[in-house]
Design a protein with these regions (language model features):
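Alpha-helical scaffold/interaction cores of sigma-54-like transcription cofactors
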Residues: 1-340
Length: 340
């Protein structure tokens, strides 16, 4: 029975009732097979219930008064810490902010590499003051030597970097933002436009100021917000509501925003055809769009790892090997990379 139920679309789970509507075989089995009907009816009663307790690894909820005045709480079964019983959406409805404090292993790798450079070469490196136009760094990225780099490793990203031939930190930021489901489909066009500026076009001239740094491609959530403000007449408050709708990936909320955005585009001078064309560029960001500050933060750390690997490869690869010392297969891969 489960094999007949399709997956949901991006950001939206498939329901049993919807599956019965759209899958003729499932609909027929439900109507004609008593056992199938009994199993599906039982499944419907459990649908939507929490299957297990999961805790966000980095989520911290803050409150002005004791937490239990806002949300039911319990002890985390694994660690003994107090956790909320509300999920992230209910927590927001209760008026509480949730902050994600993420740890990045690559920061420890950077620190170890910097320590080794100082010990061996007597050079003090401040990773926050590296030149952002280092030729060796961009040449290494263009060759696809990305193993051990933050956010830039992996076969898919490496292939795109070799095609892109990045030449600025902006290219790295853009790749960090685009390399995820949805926006990823724009990467080939981004590469084409970087290589041939004659291909850069804008649906409306007003988009030039917003998108000129990304060759006319919508790349960040910020691009969507500025487009809504500049071309649909949104206020900053309305744009922030659009951002929240995109971040939460709630289909019905996005549908309402789509209708409002299209109406705003048309009211502010776009034809219906161009308004829909612009929406088709915005829509992929509804599920996985990156904020520019987020992409720039990740992009900077990615560049820092690339700079150290390009300029101090022995020290950087030693730091990576130390970090992965508990994984023999990883260590073997690192040794193979070093031998190249």
């Amino acid at each position: 029975i489960s094999s007949m139920i399709p997956l949901g679309t991006q950001g939206s789970a498939m329901t049993i009732d919807n599956a019965i509507k759209i899958v003729p075989e499932l609909k027929s089995a439900y109507k004609t097979e008593p056992d199938t009907k009994r199993i599906i009816d039982l499944a419907k009663k459990m649908e939507g219930c929490v299957r297990h307790i999961s805790v966000h690894a980095a989520g911290v909820v803050m409150a002005p008064r004791p937490l239990w005045e806002f949300t039911p709480v319990q002890y985390d079964p694994k660690g003994g810490h107090i956790i909320t019983q509300y999920d992230m959406y209910s927590i927001e409805d209760a008026g509480l902010p949730k902050f994600d404090f993420l740890g990045i292993r690559n920061l420890a790798i950077l620190a170890e590499a910097v320590r080794l450079v100082k010990k061996i070469h007597k050079i003090d490196i401040d990773v926050d003051k590296l030149p952002l136009n280092d030729k060796k760094t961009f040449e290494m990225l263009a060759r696809g030597e990305t193993m051990g780099l933050f956010q830039l490793n992996g076969s898919g990203m490496t292939r795109y970097l070799k095609e892109l031939q990045p030449s600025s930190i902006h290219d790295i930021n853009a790749m960090v933002a685009l390399y995820r489901p949805g926006p990823m489909e724009m990467i080939p066009e981004y590469i084409k436009r970087k290589k041939n500026p004659n291909l850069i076009t804008y649906i409306d001239p007003r988009l030039k100021d917003i998108l000129k740094m990304s060759y006319g491609i919508i790349t960040y959530q910020d691009d969507v917000l500025f487009t809504a403000i500049g071309l649909a007449g949104y206020s900053w408050l309305e744009a922030d509501k659009l951002r929240k709708a995109m971040g939460k990936k709630i289909p019905e909320v996005m549908q309402a925003e789509k209708e409002k955005l299209l109406a705003g585009f048309i009211k502010n001078g776009l034809t219906e055809k161009k308004a829909n064309e612009l929406w088709s560029l915005i829509e992929p960001f509804a599920a996985y769009g990156f904020g520019k500050a987020h992409a720039a933060s990740y992009g900077l750390v990615a560049y820092q790892t690339a700079y150290l690997k390009a300029n101090y490869p022995v020290e950087y690869m030693t730091a990576i090997m130390t970090s992965e010392s508990g994984d023999i297969e990883k260590v073997a891969e690192i040794i193979n990379e070093c031998q190249k």
